């Protein structure tokens, strides 16, 4: 009987554990409204409250942060910003505007959670 119970538990674990993998990865939500050729080079970053240039179009947004069990090393400010910049390049953005930057907090998440908007300059 113990052997059968052990086999059932092991089978259940082999089915459950792979489905938990997404909980250990950086959460990333990308919404792109307009598609452009990928951008190469430097992507400018505008901080919250900073004046945005004129003649721009918002092409999308990116949210990155903790997904549940994300290791702290995988959701530092640098890792989150690199992820946002990579997504901005794929979408063809010229610059990023940081809407919200939530720093790690001992009462909540130990990871950065960043919301950014992706913009492109209007070409005349």
Language-model features, listed with the residues they occupy:
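Short, well-ordered alpha-helical segments
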Residues: 59-100
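Extracellular disulfide-stabilized recognition modules
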Residues: 51-61
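Sec-dependent bacterial lipoprotein signal peptides
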Residues: 1-21
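Short acidic, glycine/proline-enriched helix-loop-strand junctions
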Residues: 57, 66-68, 104-124
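Post-signal peptide N-terminal segment of mature Sec-exported envelope proteins
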Residues: 30-51
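Bacterial Sec signal peptide processing site at the extreme N-terminus
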Residues: 14-36
């Amino acid at each position: 009987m113990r052997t059968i119970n052990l086999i059932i538990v092991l089978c259940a674990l082999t089915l459950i554990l792979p489905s938990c993998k997404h909980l250990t990865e950086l959460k990333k939500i990308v919404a792109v409204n307009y598609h452009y050729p990928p951008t190469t080079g430097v992507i400018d970053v505008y901080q919250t409250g900073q004046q945005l240039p004129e003649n721009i179009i918002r092409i999308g947004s990116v949210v990155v942060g903790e997904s549940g069990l994300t290791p702290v090393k995988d959701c530092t400010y640098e890792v989150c910003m690199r992820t946002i910049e990579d997504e901005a390049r794929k979408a063809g953005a010229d610059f990023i505007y940081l809407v919200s930057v939530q720093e790690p907090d001992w009462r909540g998440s130990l990871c950065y959670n960043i919301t950014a908007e992706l913009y492109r300059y209007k070409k005349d």
